Amino acid sequence: MRLLQIIHSFVFSRSPLTAAALLWGLLWQPVQAEEIIEEQVVVGDLNSLPGENVDSVFGFDRSILETPRSASTVSEEMMDRFNMQDIDELILVSPGSFTQSFFGVAGGLDVRGTPGETYFRGVRRLDNPGNYPTPIGASDRVDIVRGPASPIYGPAKIGGYLNFNPKSARIEETGAYIEENTGALSYTTGSWNKSVLTAEIGGPAEIGGKPMGFYLYGELENSDSFYKNAPGVEQSLIQASFDVDVNETIQLQFGGMYHDFAGAQNAGWNRITQDLIDNGTYITGLAKPLDTNGDGKISHQEFDVDGDGFTDLNPFAWWVSPLGPNYAGTFEEFSQPFGADAGDFFNTSVMALEAVGTAKLDPSRTLIASDDTLENEVTTLYFDIIAELESGWEITNKLFYESYDNLNENAYGFSQFHETYVIEEKLVIGKLFEGDNMRAAVNFSPSLRYTDFEHADDYTNEYFHRRDLTGPSTALDARLLATRIHDDYTEYYIGDYMDLGVAFMADLTWYNGLSILAGIRYDSIEMESRQPVDKLLLASSNNFCTDGSCIDVSADNDVSGTSWTFSISYDIADTGLIPYITLSEQATVIAGQGGELTVSNVASGGAFDTSELTEFGVKGQLLEDRLYFSLSVYEQERTDFSAQSIVTNQAVKTEGTEFEIRWSVNEQLLVGMTYTQVEATNLASVADGDRFSFIGAGDLPNIAPELLFGGQIGGA
């Protein structure tokens, strides 16, 4: 896949709406207002060239130019000038990154063909694959690092990560506070009653006679949606950061973020055919009624038409493969693979639609039902103590806490919840040594990270096609969700895991331009997970038995591993060019959507794995340092194809090329370009020779789709 993106932007800013439009009440009741626009020339390079020191890659203060890894940084000014509203828009200025398309919720990015992670001030956050939209407005800078994290940060995914640096009153380059209070107030309105109010203020202050800085940011949104039945978005965000100089030796940095989000995921269209894509022609029709007790919902038990304990609308057609040639048989042959004398393999009559017709589908009509919901409450806190000793040693104690409470319900047949929290305690001891020919920076870092999780999924009898999108969700398609009765879950995991790690990093730079960066880390992880059997559906898509004999009830295990990295680079004098080579092996924990570990992965040791990276590249600054470029060629691979989480951490091998240019032509004009070529291979699918997939209408060209849209055929 190739991606070529060119950014060519004259930058200007628009004044806010009139003061009356900034009243609090407008957040909830948007009114019509005339927008007054002024054009204002912005001077400088828009803070879009990577000149600042960034410690989110290796833990040392190096600029992106000097860092021997493929990485990009996006400043607050750059996000403002390019009008970036959510995390997905960061891909415009970062090669190797892609939107996840996770049911319309911008929780994270795919980096180098696999799901990426998010970090907050250099500490890994809980997984967020569509749990809630990750906010970017409260960030001073976002660093996008491609490939696994450095050993100093602990186990990490293979693809890469985004590190969010919250707005602060302390100037990162100098360590001083901003000279005076500064703030901003803005209100945004638009189509579909878009209503967003943001406010921020920060500056210097004193507490107990000690100098300090503060920065507060708040955001409120109450917006409708283009899509029918969608609840829109209601969210509130509060972020605070504080810096206190206790004395000349010790400083405190503490703060946090609270984010409350309510919306809905969007599964898009169903009953997909080529005619729908080409001409907008949608197959209408009603699924067979299954709600036998008349409560308006179809329970798992009501999907068991013949009463044998197994669903009858989700057969696994092992003799048909959407990965191979199109199935060319007839409907009768499809339903009777053993021949007419053997009887039907499954009952196709209950899957056929009734009152079939066609219609032109309004693009605003999707699978969202009126009572669908996605609710997430996340709290993030940090408290750092930094001591700069007279001997030159710097000791940093970082304490981090994050929790989220998530509920996700979709009428077509999917629900989940998770209640998870993580606490990380990290000590970093470092010093810079300077000699006649070189300087050396070292970091030693023991750490402890504890994660506690409770997570449940409900995806058995998940039927996308039963709903006729020309009308609302009804008792013909709406399923009784496990989260509403707290029973009949497909998977349910309760447990915890604790990672004890120790890392050492060294950054060696000779004054002739040669630089070596190396590090090693050891992790020992205690993990346990269990399933409450009384809350599970039997049989289900995860447990293929009706008596519970197939359930992995509980497991505990101890795993350990070593991570390392080695980079060498050379700053070629008077050229502005820095070629580099990086080799690394990084541990990873195979956690799911709610940070959970499955019982089977814990029992088998498959909850822990390593990844390998080989990367070659060259970076440079030319034209009086107004043009920055970066070129990298890489190959990275998860080492154990059997250890994976399908949604969040798959066993993948990727290789490719990434290229980035940012050119500040003059004080008004910025030109940027990114290029990505990536090939991703799922190692588990290659090893198994197949991969489970839902079979669509295009895979069975000789069978009328309306004969199957009342259920869902699976295959491999």
Q: What residue spans do the PLM features occupy?
A:
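Face-selective signature of the C-terminal outer-membrane beta-barrel domain
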Residues: 377-404, 417-536, 569, 573
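Short acidic/polar hinge/loop motifs at secondary-structure boundaries
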Residues: 99, 108, 124-148
